[in-house]
């Protein structure tokens, strides 16, 4: 037998059992391999379990964020329409109620809270006196961009940029059904919170003449 062959056989025996007489006994090498295999299996199981928990956590966070967004869309709009908060100080207390009249776009712009302490805005062709909400609709307010303007498009698209304002009369004809429904909802909310003082006139449209009786009747309805 060559020496090289003996070396190979010794190496083989060294990696097996110390004695082959027991037949069924497990060698240290086999035990180590089994332990190593079990370790990998445990690690893989832990990884899969951890990954499942991570996916579950991500899903829960996504659901919470979706719920918060829906609440913001639903109640945030109401908060915007409910501008006058309890205990809010505003110049409205010193201003008499405005007599009912109709406005052109140019006339409406005079009531932006800077040139005139009274603040008006239009929604869906209706003009509302929002002076008591000056904290919100005044020049320094978060929604001051709507003061003295037709706010319909901005409210329908929830856009507070100048892009939502039109210098000419806006017939809103390009808004879709959902956006127009939003405009009507805003109109109802402003009717509940603020004084309706007249209509926003279309180009060439003549203003209506309102009697004191009609004016008083409208104010009583709002009260």
UniProtKB/Swiss-Prot annotation:
Main location: membrane
Localization annotation: Membrane; Nucleus envelope; Endoplasmic reticulum; Secreted
Transmembrane segments: 42-66
Superkingdom, natural source: Eukaryota
Signal peptide span: none
SMART domains: Cyt-b5 (SM01117)
Phosphothreonine: residues bearing it: 211
Coiled coil: none
Topology of the protein relative to the lipid bilayer: Single-pass membrane protein
Glycosylation site list: 15
Record GO terms (molecular function): heme binding; heme transmembrane transporter activity; nuclear steroid receptor activity; steroid binding
Biased composition annotated in UniProt, kind: Acidic residues: 206-215
Residue positions where Phosphoserine is found in the record: 90, 104, 208
Positions of the UniProt region annotated as Disordered: 1-33, 202-223
InterPro entries: Cyt_B5-like_heme/steroid-bd, Cyt_B5-like_heme/steroid_sf, MAPR/NEUFC/NENF-like
Tissue: Expressed by endometrial glands and stroma (at protein level). Detected in urine (at protein level).
Note: Non-classical progesterone receptors involved in extranuclear signaling are classified in 2 groups: the class II progestin and adipoQ receptor (PAQR) family (also called mPRs) (PAQR5, PAQR6, PAQR7, PAQR8 and PAQR9) and the b5-like heme/steroid-binding protein family (also called MAPRs) (PGRMC1, PGRMC2, NENF and CYB5D2).
Family, as annotated: Belongs to the cytochrome b5 family. MAPR subfamily.
Description of its domains: The cytochrome b5 heme-binding domain lacks the conserved iron-binding His residues at positions 137 and 161.
Protein's name according to its UniProt entry: Membrane-associated progesterone receptor component 2
Organism name: Homo sapiens
Biological classification of the source: Eukaryota, Metazoa, Chordata, Craniata, Vertebrata
Encoding gene per record: PGRMC2
